[in-house]
From Swiss-Prot:
GO terms for molecular function: glucose-6-phosphatase activity. It is found in: Endoplasmic reticulum membrane. Hydrolyzes glucose-6-phosphate to glucose in the endoplasmic reticulum. May form with the glucose-6-phosphate transporter (SLC37A4/G6PT) a ubiquitously expressed complex responsible for glucose production through glycogenolysis and gluconeogenesis. Probably required for normal neutrophil function. This is Glucose-6-phosphatase 3. Substrate binds at residues 79, 161. It is a multi-pass membrane protein. The lineage of its organism: Eukaryota, Metazoa, Chordata, Craniata, Vertebrata. Its EC number is 3.1.3.9. InterPro entries: Glucose-6-phosphatase, P_Acid_Pase_2/haloperoxi_sf, P_Acid_Pase_2/haloperoxidase. Optimum pH is 6.5. Pathway: Carbohydrate biosynthesis; gluconeogenesis. It catalyses: D-glucose 6-phosphate + H2O = D-glucose + phosphate. CDD domains: PAP2_glucose_6_phosphatase. Residues 1-24, 78-108, 160-167, 219-254, 305-307 are lumenal.
Length: 346
């Protein structure tokens, strides 16, 4: 295993020093592959393109992120930015590597969340685009473009994580494989417009299930805060250690999104607009308005206390599906003052 980890450091060093002109590209790619962006950008964009697709993206995202959290608790993967010091590798071998603001994530490293969650959530997007392309083109070369773009983007995300010293190559590979498999398995099985109790119980199961596993492992003598301690110890700058990278931050986001999805699907606003077919201009207006509300939510910031941070994060991601699915389309449709035509499947 030591040789595998050492090879990962060598690969990261090569990416940082032999391709210095690509630094900004890797930083941008890792930003695009951040699971948080799936909730904030990909989910609204997919929903306003297709109602079914948007709900699929949100559902798969929070289920995949929850599973990634559980996998990390059991696999105990080191991250390169702390392993290189803890193992003594940096004192035994002369290396030239440096950290970035995105390097200092506090959770365990295996498997890569960026690769696993993004790979799972973008699978229905890729298949939906592939179906559209296949219906309009007979060229086999054109038909493979969506799948090729999906693979290329995930490969770039994986390389960016190695470049940033956030993951070892084998953690990236594991995330890619598990993410694609999850996307393939879950896409046909996403629940659509179930009763509110179903989503409430899902949120409760995510919260209680992870908490039960955490306290069981803690009772058995396993310190699950070990990765937080190492990240704080070896990160070059304290301000690079962000609270939203902590394991329970993702748990509050996932359970909040599950509950918010159920609430959104049972609001009076959603009941009024679900029979409406929004035009392209209205869909663009919905996305722009949703992004404006997102900017406002981000502007509010987070409380510094960790417990209040988790509560605020839960409430924020409970509210977000309600805004995207119900309130924003209702406002746009009402202001446009158009008569809703019959239901169109999407």
């Amino acid at each position: 295993m030591e040789s595998t980890l050492s090879a990962g450091i060598i690969m990261a060093e090569a990416l940082q020093n032999r391709l210095p002109g690509l630094e900004n590209m890797w930083l941008w790619v890792t930003f695009l592959g951040d699971p948080k962006n799936l909730f904030q950008f990909c989910f609204p964009a997919a929903y306003y393109a297709s109602r079914r697709l948007g709900i699929s993206v949100l559902w798969i995202t929070f289920i995949a992120e929850w599973l990634n959290l559980v996998f990390k608790w059991f696999l105990f993967g080191d991250r390169p930015f702390w392993w290189v010091h803890e193992s003594g590798y940096s004192t035994q071998t002369p290396i030239q590597i440096h950290q970035f603001p995105s390097s200092c994530e506090t959770g365990p490293g295996s498997p890569s969340g960026h690769c696993m969650i993004t790979g799972a959530a973008l699978w229905p997007v890729m298949t939906a685009i592939s179906s559209q392309v296949a219906s309009r083109s007979r060229s086999p070369w054109v038909r493979v473009i969506p799948g090729l773009a999906y693979c290329t983007f995930l490969l770039a995300v994986g390389l960016s994580r190695v470049f940033l010293l956030a993951h070892f190559p084998h953690q990236v590979l594991g995330g890619l494989i598990v993410g694609a498999a999850l996307g393939w398995l879950m896409s046909p099985r996403v629940p659509m417009e179930r009763e509110l109790s179903f989503y409430g119980l899902t949120a409760l199961a995510l919260m209680l299930g992870a908490s039960l596993m955490y306290w069981t492992l803690f009772t058995l003598g396993l310190d699950l805060s070990w990765s937080i301690n190492l990240a704080s110890k070896w990160c070059e700058r304290p301000e690079w250690v962000h609270m939203d990278s902590r394991p329970f931050a993702s748990l509050s986001r996932d359970s909040g999104s599950a509950l918010g999805l159920g609430i959104a699907l049972h609001t009076p606003c959603y009941a009024q607009i679900r029979r409406a077919h929004l035009g392209n201009g209205q869909k663009i207006a919905c996305f722009v308005l949703a992004m404006g509300l997102l900017v406002f939510l981000e502007w509010l910031g987070y409380p510094p206390q960790i417990s209040l941070f988790y509560i605020f994060n839960f409430l924020k991601y409970t509210l977000w599906p309600c805004l995207v699915l119900a309130l924003v389309p209702w406002v746009v449709h009402t202001l446009s003052d158009q008569e809703a035509p019959p239901i169109r499947s999407s």
